[in-house]
């Protein structure tokens, strides 16, 4: 099964996550199929907290990819900010 989930990067006490498409059997920080965005939970000021390539996410979801709970909530956050910006 293909999943869209987070993989951790960054330094100790300063997490940074890539939003990736991967097979569910792969390790958390293992091999991935495609990187579709990133998430910075400690973003401050003008830094962007979540960046997603919505076209690619929609493509993978149409082709059967499952979203993890955290990625689903980030997707809602991005769509909400895009709606208020438009």
Swiss-Prot record:
Signal peptide: none
Single GO molecular function: structural constituent of ribosome
Domain of life: Bacteria
Gene Ontology BP, a term: translation
Gene Ontology, cellular component aspect: cytoplasm; small ribosomal subunit
The keyword Amino-acid biosynthesis belongs to this UniProt entry's keyword annotation: no
PROSITE patterns for this protein: RIBOSOMAL_S16 (PS00732)
Pfam families referenced in this protein's UniProt entry, alphabetically: Ribosomal_S16
Entry keywords, A to Z: Ribonucleoprotein, Ribosomal protein
Family affiliation: Belongs to the bacterial ribosomal protein bS16 family.
Protein name stated in the entry: Small ribosomal subunit protein bS16
Source species: Xylella fastidiosa (strain Temecula1 / ATCC 700964)
């Amino acid at each position: 099964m293909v999943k869209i989930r987070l993989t951790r990067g960054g330094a100790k006490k300063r997490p940074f996550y890539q939003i990736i498409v991967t097979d569910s059997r792969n390790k958390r920080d293992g091999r991935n199929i495609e990187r579709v965005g990133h998430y910075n939970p400690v973003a401050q000021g003008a830094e962007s907290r979540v960046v997603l390539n919505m076209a690619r996410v929609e493509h993978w979801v149409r082709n059967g990819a499952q979203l993890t709970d955290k990625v689903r909530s980030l997707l809602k956050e991005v769509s909400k900010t895009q709606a208020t910006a438009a």
